[in-house]
């Protein structure tokens, strides 16, 4: 019940702002799906495109999922949380949740865009790990139907949830590529030196103490 309440609050927090934002996005897809708890709370179509980050579309479903996640996290640590109360100077709990959510979806979108640009995809081992993880979830919740109910409580479709899970593995593959000498993403010495110069960093080979 608490999860449902949190998601309803998340929907109320964001509905007015996002409805306005989507109305300003012109040619972006507004969506047609009407399923899910977060749609009931916000009135936003899950498949509606909310924003573009590096050419990667962020759907209302993904944004609302992460917003509900943030709200649930905050409500765990702040009893009877007042979302309009000030957390810090000029920033309410509601503001913080929305800002943090935006940073999360931006990160996930950038990872997907960079992976696509670099031709990085999931490996067979990644897919096996994802399949094993799903099986763990199904077992934990007591079967396939129970797992699907849990996703419904979270207000997200399995397709969207899988998309999020896969991004974590793409992030690891990107990290591997950046750290593997000889890969297309591995920065050479000149690139690192230029980056240091552009950002006013000091570099050195040996530090004597």
Regions found by a protein language model. Give the residues of each.
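Hydrophobic/aromatic residues in well-formed alpha-helices
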Residues: 58, 63, 127-130, 161, ...
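Acidic/histidine-rich, surface-exposed loop or edge segments in extracytoplasmic proteins
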Residues: 91, 111, 208-209
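Structured, amphipathic secondary-structure segments that form assembly/contact surfaces
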Residues: 142, 147-161
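Acidic/polar surface patches and capping/hinge elements
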Residues: 34-37, 162, 169-207
